[in-house]
């Protein structure tokens, strides 16, 4: 009898239980009741916590980090909108320009190579507003980042990016001219010249010029800007007058009163000449001293002179309207003024140095004589035009200086 009860008990585990009508299934032994409800607790001081200063600062920092991250968004419209919001944010939080200058320029400079023209235009407006607000001591160490992407844009495979690159270079040149020391442009001198070589098409090995640029009556505004920015760059690096002005406007910390107050230790004289510490290069000129001088810049551009002179000649021939056919364009006079400015710079440099080779002088003299003949025709055909009167005045100054330097022999012929 006992065995039958045990057998029934074992089979009961596998039998399907038949429930009576109206009764629910029995709850298991490990059942947990979850039918209870919770109530929220509201503190009377909870609203005051959201208005504290540390929460506002944290929100601003998070918003700024969010904007910087959105600069890499895949959508061009989103990148443009982010730049506009970032502009408004920096205008309302100008301390960002002091505390996060390197980070800001590091993340915005790559947009120079952005495929969207609207993003590049928005970036140009952004840099145009803030590059003159940043302190020179903060801008100069970080301006190389903008130069890096500008050089990449000048040699970019996309024509639209290539055309917009000189807009950013013009901003950098104006910043270096007005607020920074000459070393800022000297460190970028060689690379920028190489980029202009590819952009404008002059050859560094010979006097041949790739006719990739044409400044005729149908010349584009982009190529005119390339030529104008190139002239500004050369003037800033080679013109002695601009260099003297640049040194006056740059930031140099001078303390003349220290010369009267400093007491020199007697053993200091032992370290004024290179001795056992020579391997440390403590007494050698640094990189800025080596490149920040007109001699270095002239030696760098020297191999490019034949190609540049030929480029100047071709640009003048393309833009100069020697025949009055009614198709004169305002862009032609701008090109001619810029060409005369560039030619005057190289005339001053080549003819003021006694040991310059004769072939460079001959090429410049030939270009001057050609321009002198064309100027006579311009005076006859367009002498009453205000735009061309500026060209005629510019040539008169160049002619006077060329005669002083014996660069223009027999100017009447």
Curated annotation (Swiss-Prot):
Signal peptide: none
GO cellular component labels: heterochromatin; nucleus; rixosome complex
Subcellular localization: Nucleus
Matches recorded under InterPro entries: ARM-like, ARM-type_fold, Ipi1_N
Main location: nucleus
KW Nucleus (keyword) present: yes
Keywords from the UniProt entry: Nucleus, Ribosome biogenesis, rRNA processing
Nuclease keyword on record: no
One GO term of the biological process aspect: rRNA processing
Oligomeric form and interacting partners: Component of the RIX1 complex, composed of ipi1, rix1/ipi2 and crb3/ipi3 in a 1:2:2 stoichiometry. The complex interacts (via rix1) with mdn1 (via its hexameric AAA ATPase ring) and the pre-60S ribosome particles.
Reported function: Component of the RIX1 complex required for processing of ITS2 sequences from 35S pre-rRNA.
Family as reported in the entry's similarity comment: Belongs to the IPI1/TEX10 family.
Name recorded for this polypeptide: Pre-rRNA-processing protein ipi1
